[in-house]
Each structure stands twice: as structure tokens, then as C-alpha cells.
């Protein structure tokens, strides 16, 4: 068989390997070569059968488990059971846990994904990717408080990761906790040194807060927050991030930005300061102001 393999005579090699297989040989390398040869010829069913045979006497062989999963995926079949077996045989392996959890989430089995990740976290309590994937699973499960706790633990491990701060902020936004969301968004902005992604996130935070707080008619405070959102969207766009271009366009087209007419409706003592701040309990976390424009 080895001679045929060296000569590139695949058919002859397969015949020889099949003869060895029929003899009951349990040599993993031999059977793996046979599986590869089947794969080269597109004989997927036979390839799967041989790989499964290897696992029947060597069930913890992670390399064969991975190979079988790859074959399943390339043939369009669901390899979930393979990923599950590999994870259960190696619960301390973070990569296997993450891959299995991702497959579960793709199938909508979020609770099972969370269980798998929490299990492996006991072995990998300093693995950033486990925390990040678990945080995403909690978020998909609408368990935003647990997502926040998990991501805060991750932030303690990686305090210079502005994207983790943004994710924590996003989960607070899901709970309409805009004060906490702003605190984490500000951290992201400081860590990233005002990069485009962090700027666009704060713009979206203001945009969502405005929509959560406003009534049927836009108050001056609603318009002030809308203008803050617009300002951040514009800054992010200037740095190449147009993620929220639809929201920015909506603000432009719906007469919700604080403008000249709104300015002249303000009390004189506010006009004297040259800026206006949002007011009201819903906006009591907003510390920024809208500055008077030159044409007001």
C-alpha cells in the first residue's frame, strides 16, 4: 500500500488498504490513509465509514473527530454530534468548547451552548475567547444581565480592549440602562483614543436613548440628544465608519435636530451660556451639551 501511495496509484492503494481493513487491522494511520484516499476520489460515504471505524476503537482521537466533522461540513451534513463528542471527551479544551457552542447557537440551541461554555470556563478562567463567546450566547438568549457580568469579567482580564467595553455598553442599552451604557461607551472612547468605531457607538447610544425617551412630539431635550447623536455619527463617518448611515439620514430628513428656531425659544439666561443641555429624568445621565452654531 505504501508503495502504491508513493507512486500516486490511488486505486491500487485503496484496494490494498481495503484488504488490510477486511483483515480487521486497527492501525489508525493505515485507516486514516484509506479515508483520505476515499476523500480524494469523492467517495464521502466510504470516507465517513472508515473514520467512524477508527473512532469505534479510538473514541477520544480528537484529530479523527475533527477530520470527520470537516468531512460532514464539506458534504453539507450537520456535524453537531461530532463536535459534541469531541467536546465531551475534552471538556477542558477551550477551542473544542467554543466550536461546539457556535454550532449549537447556529442551530438555535442557546441554553445548551451556555452550559457547554460555563463548563469549560471552570477549566479556562483566563481564556478571553470563552468569556467573549459566553457573553454573546447570553446576549442571544436575551439574558443581558448575565452577558454584562461575563463581559465585565473579561474586561478585568483585558482592560485595554475597547470592543469589550462597547459590548458591555450595548447590553446595558438593551436594558434601557443608558447611564451605565454611557459610562462604558466613554471608557471605550478613552481606550480607543476616539476611534471611529467608538464614536459611532456613542452616536447610536444617543440615538437609541432619544427614541426610548421621546414622546409623539419632539421636545427641545429630545432634539438636543438627536443633535448629539448626529454629531457623533458625523465624526465617525469622517473617520471612515458609516455603520449607522441610515440613522444619520433619518435624523437629517425628519426635522428632529436642534436648530436656530429652537435656540431662539430658549430663555435668555440659557442663551447667554452659548450651549443647551438636555433636561428631564430620562436624560439626567447626559453630561454633554449642544453648542450654539454661528448662524443661530
Model region roles, listed by residue range:
Residues 1-2, 6, 16, 29-36, ...:
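Canonical tetratricopeptide repeat
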